[in-house]
């Protein structure tokens, strides 16, 4: 399983995406972006991955706000938050490594 498949499967498990179009939108791109990149054997751009990471951060912030305002999260939402957190950190680590390695797209 490549990185993109891992990200997709985890975000699907967390309930954030239902299909590749949803993931494309979270990356700030058109519907077919993810399927097109996969078909061409290319990784998503740094811009798309940064956009995705910041959208995941916003999702986590919304969950934190829910808790802050006194609402309890269900066990499923807590698991989803943990998955989203892991995916976000994975993406940021990958972006950092690519930028340090000079692999800008």
Regions from the language model: what does each represent?
Residues 28-45:
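Recognition helix of helix-turn-helix/homeodomain-like DNA-binding domains
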Residues 1-15:
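A short, Lys/Arg-rich alpha-helix, primarily the initiator
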Residues 14-17, 43:
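Residues at alpha-helix boundaries and the short loops/turns that link adjacent helices
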Residues 58-66:
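N-terminal core-binding DNA-recognition domain of tyrosine recombinases/integrases
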Residues 44-59:
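Short Lys/Arg-enriched helix C-cap and helix-to-coil transition segments
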Residues 65-105:
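Helix-turn-helix/homeodomain-like alpha-helical modules used for DNA recognition
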Residues 20:
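Helix-turn-helix DNA-binding elements, focusing on the entry/boundary residues of the two helices
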Residues 23-24:
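Short alpha-helical "recognition helix" segments of helix-turn-helix
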